[in-house]
Amino acid sequence: MGIKISIKSMGMSFYIPIIFNSLLIPLIVFFVARTGNEYNIAFAVNVLTQMFTPFFGSFIVCMHMSKYIDTRGNEIYFVLNKNKSHEIMKLFLVYIMTNTCWFAAYMLLDRSFGLEWLHIIIVTFLFVSATYCFCFFFRSVSLASIPGFLYTIYSVVGLKYLGKKFSYYEQTGMEAEKLSSKYVYFIIAAIVLMSIGNALNDSYDKYNE
């Protein structure tokens, strides 16, 4: 399935994250920037993008995979091309591209947001890979959406109580040293989950009558 058909088949579900990331977040950052306080600007960009951009990546995967997993007669979608990983990766790239221009604008305010954008890309890749994997593992899109939601809550809200070791939330922004150490493991985890998802996809045989 081509990327245009994939987006069209999702309807407004695809555009909800785009509108949020490309309209609401920049609008909030714009109003914060008017205060002239660099700390507040950095805090707004870091908190809002880390809370919502990766999770919405997971949301897009769920909306796209629903027709393959949950709909009646879903076997028809697996006749010509059973493996859906290439569709997921195309959606991931389009989603990232729609957000890149805004981070370029944020970099005009603070060049360090370039590292933050790499951080967001890595974490979003992890969310996308995990959701793709869980769709076939649980054989349910609804169940597949839960881990990403819980991980977001753990990282952003439960940080003080459960520790920082597995959290992706970086309230003070991203540092090059941390990006090249801790987040290498995030990339590896994302690749492993995508590979497991591929294997589960290839062996998938649950078709709804």
Tell where the protein language model's regions lie, with residue ranges.
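Non-cytosolic membrane-interface motifs at loop->transmembrane helix junctions
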Residues: 40-49, 113-121, 170-178
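Hydrophobic alpha-helical transmembrane segments that constitute the membrane-spanning cores
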Residues: 85-115
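Aromatic-anchored segments of alpha-helical transmembrane domains
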Residues: 24-33, 98-105, 149-161
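Hydrophobic alpha-helical transmembrane segments and immediately flanking/interface helices
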Residues: 112-134
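Membrane-helix interface segments
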Residues: 84, 113, 140-144
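Hydrophobic alpha-helical transmembrane segments
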Residues: 1-51, 56-67, 125, 133-141, ...
